[in-house]
């Protein structure tokens, strides 16, 4: 009897607990609305990323040491863009790269594990009113004013609570194809002002050397503490293009490839240099072999055994 009574009491507690949770507990599943962000936002006053950057061009172009490098958004304007970054491997920290058809911008957020709520391919609506637009190393960025180590006020990270009120998830699983930045020794045609922050791919390149004498064959230094390691590429000018790797990246102590590779990543601007930031090791693949006869009429593959015949 005591055992029966015990089970009856447990069942009653479970029913009471479930009723206390109320309808709101099940609401996301019932309404289909996203469990993160602000679902009250509506798609009104939407402008492109290019228009936003044009509107705040002077602040984006100003070094914080030379003047004010950010400004508050006072208008009720929004952008609609797709997440192209991921912090899943630890190489990207507390920021999102957002991209639309006109360009890209970085959002600085004081939150780890952003890939959980906002994985690659998530389309978001971002309400910009009361946030700030400025730059970090001339890279366009959305954030809030923050005092840096030197005591200067620059654009910094939005708190998690504030950020949660400023975005709405519109859809997931969207595909963003990387645009070719360059191939081999060819110079890029990308523009630092308009293309900074975009998802790109550099093809047929190889790792040359790092800026850390202790790091000779790994991506970064996992025991080096806060900081990063920059690798130059044999085929590109190291003053213009580097591969950025955080010491906190999960792949920091992995060996860099020795052969030719294609590298996908977020191509961020840092002053007058391009920083390629990979999201995980999946962004680096052996270089695709270029077929010089691709697209030409005729038969054959151009080898001695099977010469090209265009007759």
Show which residues each predicted segment covers.
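C-terminal motif of bacterial Sec signal peptides marking the signal peptidase cleavage site
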Residues: 16-19
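Bacterial N-terminal signal peptides that target proteins for export
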Residues: 1-9
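OB-fold nucleic-acid-binding modules
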Residues: 21-93, 97-309
